[in-house]
Each structure stands twice: as C-alpha cells, then as structure tokens.
From Swiss-Prot:
One cellular-component annotation, GO: nucleoplasm
Lineage top rank: taxon: Eukaryota
Xref: Pfam families: Hormone_recep (PF00104), zf-C4 (PF00105)
Protein name, entry field: COUP transcription factor 1
Family statement: Belongs to the nuclear hormone receptor family. NR2 subfamily.
Biological-process GO terms, alphabetical: cell differentiation; negative regulation of transcription by RNA polymerase II; nervous system development
Keyword Metal-binding annotated: yes
Subunit field text: Binds DNA as dimer; homodimer and probable heterodimer with NR2F6. Interacts with GTF2B; this interaction is direct. Interacts with COPS2.
Residue segments, region Disordered: 1-82
Stretches assigned to the NR LBD domain: 185-411
Localization annotation: Nucleus
DNA-binding region: 84-159
Length: 424
C-alpha cells in the first residue's frame, strides 16, 4: 500500500501562492494524479527506484492541495486540477485575491499606491485606453478606472482586508449593466455621489453662515467661482458620468450648470443679501435702460427665492447630491449620443433619493415630493443673470459654457487661462 505524507508548508507560500523550492516533476505528477497508487507505481517503474516517503522540507516532497490551489493557481506545466486565474484588471497571472478581486502583484501595488496617496491621474486620450499586460503602464487613469470598475475596494486599502462575503456597493454603482434595485445598491450609489464632492460643505458654510462675517464683492465672486468649479469637479467624479462620451458630458453641463449652481449656493448658504450690491456694481459698470434694470432685479429676486426655498426644506448633503444627479442626467440636452441611457441614469438617481428619504425621514411622507417639486423651478433662474451677476468681473465676456467645455477637455478645473483663483 502506498503511503501519502503531507509535506510541510511555509506560511509565505500561501501569501505568494508559490513553492520556494520550485516545481518538481515527482510532486507535479503526484498532484496531478491525486495521489493514486497506479500512477505512483508507474513513476517508480519509470525511475527504477522504490517509493520512499519524504520528510518535511525535503526537495521534491509532494505538495498538498491548498498551497497554490488556494490562490487559484499552480506551478507551470502541471496537469493540475486547480484552475489558473487571471488578473481581472490586466489579464496577467493572478497572485491571489487583493482588495476584493483576483489581481496580479503589479495591479495590487498600483491600486494600493493610488488609494493611499490619493493620487489623481489624467487620460491623454478618450478615457477608454486598453488595459492588458502590454499596455497597463501606459495610462494610469484608465488603469485605476478599471480597478474600480471590476470591483477593487478602496475601503480595503484604508482599513485592511475585508471579508469576501461583504457586499461592495461601489462595484454595483460603477457597473454599466442592468439596473440593480435594492437598498444596498442605492445607499452605495449615494455614498459615491457624496465622495465626489470636491470640498466639504463646511468649507463654505463656516465662512458664509457666520452672521458677523461681512464678505466683500470680490469674496462673493470668488465663492461663486468655487461653486461653479465644484459642480464640474463633482460631475467628473460621480458614477457613470466619466464613462459618457466627452461631447455628452459637455452638453449636459452646458445645459444644467446654472441649476447646479443654485443647488450649490443653497447648500453652502451663500449670503444672498449682497446680490443687490453686486447688481448695483454691475449696472454701474454696464449701464442699462430702466426696463432692463427692472427685469434684471426681478431675476435676482427669483434667484434669491429659489435658494431660500431650498434652505427652508433643510436639505441634507445626501439629498443635495441626489438632486444634483437628477438635474445633471437630463435627456433634454441637445445632441446626446444615447438619450435613453441618460434618462435611465436620471431614474437611478431619483430612485436612490426616494429610497434614502423614506429610510431617513419616515415621519415626513411628503418630503420626497417636495424635493422633486423644487427642481423645475430651478430653470426659472436665468443663467445669463447668474453669469452677469457673479462672473463678469472674473471672466469678462467669455461665456460660462466655453469655460465648462475647457474645464472638461483640460482635465482640471483650476488650470485655465481666464482667471487665477487659489483653492488651497
């Protein structure tokens, strides 16, 4: 009777998924044959040596299933039953499960470095570069994007390894597949919307909400510029939007920037008492007829009313993020390549808001409806009035739509030639 002795296994072998002693023909044959007596007799007959049990650490000791097999890989050339698993990012040989997915050492290290250092990359092409063994180092932006899309977890880098059975809301939100309904998906989607905010709300609120803090015209114009920048930065980092064609991104933001600006102004409690002062200064620089002055001041009043009505609802940060996503993903924009897809993204955002409101405000059954009813009114605020009120001193006659296009194409909201604002 053949006697099978389990070989000693170094813990490092489980981590690396390999055998430090290197592949051994006898060990490979024993592993591939499952330790059957018939194959062992054939080995002995072929070698002319009797079978002798080997001790731990002896070269050529038969490996037990679970060393390389636990990582989904085995030594090259073996006829093993273990399946070779590729890196889900680049297709290279996986070294195990890292941050929720099977990846190679290179992609594991790249993802960990990118998350820990909070690195930001820029794609020089169309944000759809091929990521494989030969091209993975050519575009860091697309490589990180693919890491997130296949489900690698940022939280696992920051907090240590997470159990594989734990759901990953970010993976659901970043997958352009069939719509996933359910609280887990929706709450994960909202968390990604919130994470995309470039600045904490308190950064504005701490300055704007202090009653004794008097802000000058220049400060208000700078704050307005920051609100516009934050809208573009937020959109560029939320789920689904970066995957759209750049022409669609430009079309959506050019149509909705003023609505996003009003939402941001309400969210940061922008001091609206200075609006008449801004108007007076603007009218002094560019005189208008009496009729135009009346119309202009009426539009300022509408802007103030919309902001105050939003503030009266005490909208929280998650609700603001959902409202902005509903506004942004509108199929009303001209020239969209796939209007139906944009509309489906708007429905996703609306469902997320409804689920959130029902779970967080169960005693306010009409809250969801009140929030949605505020959105059509945002379009009553004239974008040209916002432009003339807050931005004419900074950018002159350059249209805001042109600035938005340049921001998206340049990959940075703060490196543009029209003005210089320090956003430290």
């Amino acid at each position: 009777m053949a006697m099978v002795v389990s070989s000693w296994r170094d813990p490092q072998d489980d981590v690396a998924g390999g055998n430090p002693g290197g592949p051994n023909p006898a060990a490979q044959a024993a592993r591939g044959g499952g330790g059957g007596a018939g194959e062992q007799q054939q080995q002995q007959a072929g070698s002319g040596a009797p079978h002798t049990p080997q001790t731990p650490g002896q070269p050529g000791a038969p490996a037990t299933p679970g060393t390389a097999g636990d990582k989904g890989q085995g030594p090259p050339g073996s006829g093993q039953s273990q399946q070779h698993i590729e890196c889900v990012v680049c297709g290279d040989k996986s070294s195990g499960k890292h941050y929720g997915q099977f990846t190679c050492e290179g992609c594991k290290s790249f993802f960990k470095r990118s998350v820990r250092r909070n690195l930001t990359y820029t794609c020089r092409a169309n944000r759809n570069c091929p990521i494989d063994q030969h091209h993975r180092n050519q575009c860091q932006y697309c490589r990180l994007k693919k890491c997130l899309k296949v489900g690698m977890r940022r939280e696992a880098v920051q907090r240590g390894r997470m159990p594989p059975t734990q759901p990953n809301p970010g993976q659901y939100a970043l997958t352009n597949g069939d719509p996933l309904n359910g609280h887990c998906y929706l709450s994960g989607y909202i968390s990604l919307l919130l994470r995309a905010e470039p600045y904490p709300t308190s950064r504005y609120g701490s300055q704007c909400m202090q009653p004794n803090n008097i802000m000058g015209i220049e400060n208000i114009c700078e704050l307005a510029a920051r609100l516009l920048f934050s809208a573009v930065e937020w959109a560029r980092n939320i789920p689904f939007f970066p995957d759209l064609q750049i022409t669609d991104q430009v079309s959506l933001l050019r149509l909705t920037w003023s609505e996003l600006f009003v939402l941001n102004a309400a969210q940061c409690s922008m001091p609206l008492h200075v609006a008449p002062l801004l108007a007076a200064a603007g009218l002094h620089a560019s005189p208008m007829s009496a009729d135009r002055v009346v119309a202009f001041m009426d539009h300022i009043r509408i802007f103030q009313e919309q902001v105050e009505k939003l503030k009266a609802l005490h909208v929280d940060s998650a609700e603001y993020s959902c409202l902005k996503a509903i506004v942004l993903f509108t199929s009303d924009a001209c020239g969209l390549s796939d209007a139906a897809h944009i509309e489906s993204l708007q429905e996703k955002s609306q469902c997320a808001l409804e689920e959130y409101v029902r779970s967080q405000y169960p005693n306010q059954p009409s809250r969801f409806g009140k929030l949605l009813l505020r959105l059509p009114s945002l379009r009553t605020v004239s974008s040209s009035v916002i432009e003339q009120l807050f931005f004419v001193r900074l950018v002159g006659k350059t249209p805001i739509e042109t600035l938005i296009r340049d921001m998206l194409l340049s990959g940075s909201s703060f490196n543009w030639p029209y003005m210089s604002i320090q956003c430290s």
